[in-house]
């Protein structure tokens, strides 16, 4: 029902090792540093891991905040980096540079460098709501309702 981690191959030790290595490799291959990017987004199993690795690599809160969604919406697993990228692209301008680093539990990490082109101006962004608008349109539920929908509470047969 819940994801489990395979000791040293997943979870905290692996996340920081793989994400750091992939990020540093991209920096070396592209002759860049964190300060050279407008935005950055990392895999987000929680809010702490990406914030910590971003700081260790030299990224600022201004660079990472728009792409850091896990503290607000939880762990979206493989969708985390892409949702962060969507939020960044909603505000991106031509010339902005974007650093992305995804991570797969125990399988490693991949880092990418992107540059927003002038072509972004040609897209009619009014066709779809911005991600921030969707995230603001929430319905809060109490714990009992949440537990019911998640199958944590099972109603008895009255026996």
Locate the predicted segments by residue.
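Active-site pocket-shaping loop/turn-to-helix segments
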Residues: 1-21, 71-79, 83
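A generic structural signal for ordered alpha-helices
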Residues: 1-4, 31, 63
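Short, contiguous, pocket-lining structural segments
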Residues: 7-19, 32, 41-49
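Claisen-condensing/thiolase-fold acyl-transfer catalytic domains that form or cleave C-C bonds
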Residues: 39-159
């Amino acid at each position: 029902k819940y994801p489990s981690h395979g000791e040293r191959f997943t979870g905290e030790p692996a996340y920081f090792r793989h994400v750091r290595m992939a990020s540093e490799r991209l920096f070396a291959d592209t002759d860049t540093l964190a300060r050279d990017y407008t935005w950055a987004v990392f895999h987000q199993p929680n809010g702490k891991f990406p914030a910590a690795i971003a700081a260790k690599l030299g990224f600022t809160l201004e660079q990472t905040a728009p792409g850091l969604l896990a503290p607000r919406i939880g762990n979206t697993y493989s969708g985390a980096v892409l949702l962060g990228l969507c939020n960044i692209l909603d505000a991106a301008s031509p010339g902005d540079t974007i650093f992305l680093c995804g991570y797969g539990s125990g399988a490693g990490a991949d880092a990418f460098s992107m540059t927003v082109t002038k072509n972004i101006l040609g897209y009619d962004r009014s066709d779809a709501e911005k991600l921030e608008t969707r995230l603001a349109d929430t319905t809060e539920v109490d714990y009992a309702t949440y537990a019911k929908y998640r199958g944590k509470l099972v109603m008895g047969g009255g026996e």
